[in-house]
Curated annotation (Swiss-Prot):
Pfam families, sorted: E1_DerP2_DerF2
Example of a GO biological process term: sterol transport
Family classification: Belongs to the NPC2 family.
Keywords: Allergen, Disulfide bond, Secreted, Signal
Gene: DERP2
Gene Ontology cellular component list: extracellular region
One function term, GO molecular function aspect: sterol binding
Signal sequence region: 1-17
Disulfide bonds: 25-136, 38-44, 90-95
Locations listed in the record: Secreted
Source organism of the structure: Dermatophagoides pteronyssinus (European house dust mite)
This protein's name: Mite group 2 allergen Der p 2
Length: 146
């Protein structure tokens, strides 16, 4: 019995290990956000000059032929558009999207080497459809380091 409990505990820990706590900034379409190396509400370290991976599962709130990614970062209170983003979300998931269906988007981009170091970073990621916001998440526990 103890072996089964241990196995179940390890399985749950493995599944949840990269899940990040985020605030929904739309209508609760976000089901989960995964970032390798980031856990729950612990600070997520973003490394300058390195790839950053993000995976989100969301439920489409509209039928849409296209989808666009918008990523903004508030660094020590100054909000900026994140440079180097490929805005075409259809490159990272199958389009068109159907209202009520769940989608998994996996996105990787290189963090610019010139990004300022900061211990106070808030990242907002939006996926936009033909009729507005499909999904939106805010990660408040991020830091930019070398």
């Amino acid at each position: 019995m103890m072996y089964k409990i241990l196995c179940l505990s390890l399985l749950v820990a493995a599944v949840a290990r990269d899940q990040v706590d985020v605030k929904d900034c739309a209508n609760h379409e976000i089901k989960k956000v995964l970032v390798p190396g980031c856990h729950g509400s612990e600070p997520c370290i973003i490394h300058r000059g390195k790839p950053f991976q993000l995976e989100a599962v969301f439920e489409a709130n509209q039928n849409t032929k296209t989808a666009k990614i918008e990523i903004k970062a508030s660094i020590d209170g100054l909000e900026v558009d994140v440079p180097g983003i490929d805005p075409n979300a259809c490159h990272y998931m199958k389009c068109p999207l159907v209202k009520g269906q769940q989608y998994d988007i996996k996105y990787t981009w290189n963090v610019p080497k010139i990004a300022p170091k900061s211990e106070n970073v808030v990242v907002t990621v939006k996926v936009m459809g033909d009729d507005g916001v499909l999904a939106c998440a805010i990660a408040t526990h991020a830091k930019i380091r070398d």
